[in-house]
Amino acid sequence: MRLPKLEGKTGSTELNRQFLGYRHVDAPDEGAFYEMENVTSERYPLMAPRSPRAKLYTLQNPGGLCAKTALAWTENGKLYYGGEAVADVSEGEKTFVSMGAWLIVFPDGVRYNTADGTVDAIGQKNVTDGTVNFTLCEADGTAYSDYTVSETEPEDTTKYWLCTGSDPHCLKKYSAATKLWNTIPTTYVMISAAGIGRNLAEGDTVTVSGVLDSVGADLNGEMLLQQAADDAVVVVGFLDETASQTNAVTLERKAPKLDYVVECNNRLWGCSSEENEIYACKLGDATNWNCFAGLATDSYTVSVGSDGPFTGAAVQLGYVLFFKENCLHKVYGSKPSNFQVSMTACEGVQPGSAKSLCMVGSTLYYKADHGVMAYDGSVPESVSAALGGVYYQNAVAGTERGRLYLSMQDAAESWHLFVYDTETGIWCREDAAHAAAFATLNGNAYMLDADGCVWKLTPAE
């Protein structure tokens, strides 16, 4: 019996030599994956499973996470630094800003000094309870105890003359050299009462209110403190005579209500959507936002002309950036007299994605409404074509060793944790982690998830 001759089939082998990551697009390239879970590009060009995470803490009612020389977070109305409770704060979501040794918590305005453990506040409000005394004095607080009050020149030239014949009244001193009464250009008033200067300092700008018209209405308003002690302050002013009152006097060091805050060049910078303004604190002094003495160290305020609320703030290569949905404002200059604010129309930060602003190397990344953008100082460009046409929102970002971690929510309210390798341009999807905040300490990334767990992302110890 003869059998038919069979033709052998030749086999073929396809070898993929390069991993191209996550590409959620029609017909992804060979080496790319439409769906992905727990994959990393750390071993590029090879595909590899991501490193396991290490759970460090489980927090109750956390408000955020950050890092200086140690991890910091808020939990149940307490600020923790390095695992130790260091200050009281309100509950709710927080923004952390580092300025020198200070860690500042917004919107509370509470400051913790990581070097010496000092705790204080940006704002301060003192209201008197009892008698308030007002005394004409010199800049150092020394009272003018011996002077003549009259409309015309007094015969006694050894004393000061409080001239009531001029408008406004003034204080004069006789000069033996010129034989003339010379007006003292600046006079001061000491306001003394129990606790009136508590937690205030020389150089603070405060709002004074409650001074009776019969005492000196001009003492109400914005005042620069020349001297400050717990029970007395000295301000520029004038009195016809020593006076007192029992009505309460209020001294308040105010800070603007800020939507977003960053630190740059030893100043805090913030913005207010309600006022459509940008603010900077006094140089090196986060407690003073209303000091306008014509000095290079002054505070700064400017209104912007763009429409819509601010959606985020960041610092990139020494420049402060304030974002809206369709533009960014960039601050130039080194002091209030030469500060300038420019506007660039572009894809700004998506509302609700302020936490996506993240520096990786010299490039700023953020989530815009139509994708993930990279900004190198010129014009933002999209780097998220691989994510396809899926709409994402509420993005939160962190970084580790040149990689951008980005946790986002899709239109179906499902969460995704993506990782973008900024060196290779490869995207990976790790899992469905819902990040509330990221922090980077000693080159390692940490994540606070929506369940209150703090994770060390990679590698696990």
Describe each region flagged by the PLM.
Residues V86-G92, V132-Y160, P185-T186, L387, ...:
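Extracellular/surface-exposed low-complexity repeats and stalk/linker segments enriched in Gly/Pro
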Residues S306-E461:
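Beta-sheet-dominated scaffold domains
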Residues A70-W73, A101-V105, T152-Y174, G203-S209, ...:
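Short hydrophobic/aromatic-rich beta-strand motifs
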Residues M1-E84, N133-D140, P256-K330, M408-Y420, ...:
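N-terminal beta-propeller domains
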Residues P4-G11, G123-Q124, G130, G141, ...:
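Small/polar beta-strand repeat architecture
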Residues G77-G83, G109-Q124, K159-P185, V215-A217, ...:
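Short, surface-exposed terminal/edge motifs of secreted or surface/virion proteins that either
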Residues E42-S51, G77-D88, R111-N126, N276-T301, ...:
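Surface-exposed loop/turn elements that mediate protein-protein interactions on large endomembrane-trafficking
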